[in-house]
Amino acid sequence: MPIEFVCKIKFAEGEEAKGASTEGGGTGMLDEGLRRQKEGMADLASFASSSSLHGLARALGTSERLGFRQTLWGLALLVSLGLFLYQATWSAATYLERPHLAALREETRRELTFPAITLCNVNRFRFSALTDADIYHLANLTGLPPKSRKGHRPSELQYPPPNMLDIFQRTGHQLEDMLKSCNFSGQNCSSEDFSVVYTRYGKCYTFNGNKTSPKRVRQGGTGNGLEMMLDIQQDEYLPIWRETNETTLEAGIRVQIHSQNEPPYIHQLGFGVSPGFQTFVSCQEQRLTYLPQPWGNCRASSEPVIPGYDTYSVSACRLHCESTQVQRECNCRMVHMPGDADICAPSKIKCVDKALASLQKSTGDSCPCETPCNLTRYGKELSMVKIPSRGSARYLSRKYQKSEEYIRDNFLILDIFFEALNYETIEQKKAYDIAGLLGDIGGQMGLFIGASILTILEILDYIYEVAKNKIKQLLKPKKSQKQTNQRNLIQEQIQRTKNLREQNLKAQLTAGAIATVRFEEVKVKAANDVAQPHSAHPTSVLPNHHNAQQAVQQDFAC
């Protein structure tokens, strides 16, 4: 007859809780959103701990809850980042303002190219050279009343159509008559060394205007440049009958010093020289270099030149604008203006004056003349002495067969020379270029956050990986609704079974459990214990009704 033992068994409360937890973990599923959030925090912590950005590892190097030290490090990192962004923004704004500065230096040469000298008599027409037809046609220009034969009105007189170019050539002051003496660097010169050029003053003359082989000087000071004695011929000046836009009240010559690549714009850029004086003009060459856009507004030499000129200059641009405006409103051009249009007749002088006045009143948008990026100009200093002296007046009177009064009223001496064989260079330079910007930002980045370009690449690489994973999750194909329903049903069944087991286990833990052990099973257990003396935990003969999947240590008493 089998012998039965009645034992009261009570499970360890901690171990049972552990077993219940293990069972629940094996069958339950974590919330997907929570899992992804934890994974993201872990990835961020891993990136922060390996990043070369100073302070990031101390602030975000762990996925645990932020502590006091981590909070302080995070605040320090944010403040440093804010200061860096402020300084970097200020540096970028300064760069976008395109600041520049001017660098001035002086250089010396063994020889310098002498500038071109253009001179004009302020009187356009010689009175003695005007014919009746000239006076008739030039009435609107000169203000002189036309001559009329006895018994005929001026409107009845028949004259050939005027040719303004021919009129300027015939009636302008001739240089061979005005030039009394000429000397350049100790060598005599004559009217043949001058070329004819037409300006608003009519027929003018340019010395050293050859672009290919300009004259050069090897010494500075008086006597080492151009020295001329001129007779302005005041007795040939037109009498003033009435004032017009072309009427002049002064006597003398107009002079402009310019480079060979620049046409004369003498009515605005020239200076006057009076008779009865010797005028000394000390020059200094200035070479200017401007910055192109966006740092400046100069015109680069690579841009197309203005039609009619070999090189671009402000004077050429203004003359081109004037010619275009006059051709647009009057269908002609003045003698000194470039172009292929017909030369305006004297009857269109009022139209020309109106067109030029409208151009002058414009704001410059209709004719923007930019400064060339490379420009040569000449600074001037003028001084004068009176001529002739009492001792030389009689000598000059005998030499030129003129009265002393005529010499005082008409003669002048012009002396143009270099002060020294040096020139000034005025160059615009970038005050803050891209190299300075990158240097400032790099220094600020290292000072405030201890980062570099490679650190930025690390952050971009991390952002790329995170974005790639997010996109993969969004593009991952979803399961069918049927599979989803089946999965939900299985999860509900598992949860129901889990709850039922937890209730039974809780009841057994509270009231204790009764187990029946047969005597034969005890003997089998003893035999097993003898066969396995080294077992750390002897095998229990009690049936395990509490956890069918894993063994549980049990304490019992019979």
Curated annotation (Swiss-Prot):
Membrane topology, Extracellular segments: 93-433
PROSITE patterns: ASC
Disulfide bridge map: C120-C204, C182-C189, C298-C373, C317-C369, C321-C367, C330-C351, C332-C344
Reaction(s) catalysed (UniProt annotation): Na(+)(in) = Na(+)(out)
Gene3D superfamilies, alphabetized: Acid-sensing ion channels like domains, YojJ-like
Example GO molecular function: ligand-gated sodium channel activity
Subcellular location: Cell membrane
InterPro entries reported for this sequence: ENaC, ENaC_CS
Superkingdom to which the source organism belongs: Eukaryota
Positions of glycan attachment: N140, N183, N188, N210, N245, N374
Transmembrane segments: 72-92, 434-454
Gene Ontology CC entries for this record: plasma membrane
Positions of short motif GAS motif: 450-452
Record topological domains on the Cytoplasmic side: 1-71, 455-558
Keyword list, A-Z: Cell membrane, Disulfide bond, Glycoprotein, Ion channel, Ion transport, Membrane, Sodium, Sodium channel, Sodium transport, Transmembrane, Transmembrane helix, Transport
Entry-linked Pfam families: ASC
Listed GO biological process terms: response to steroid hormone; sodium ion transmembrane transport
Subunit and interaction comment: Homotrimer. Heterotrimer; with other ASIC proteins producing functional channels.
Role noted for this protein: Does not exhibit measurable stand-alone pH-gated sodium channel activity but may form pH-gated heterotrimeric sodium channels.
Protein known as: Acid-sensing ion channel 4-B
Protein source organism: Danio rerio (Zebrafish)
Gene: asic4b
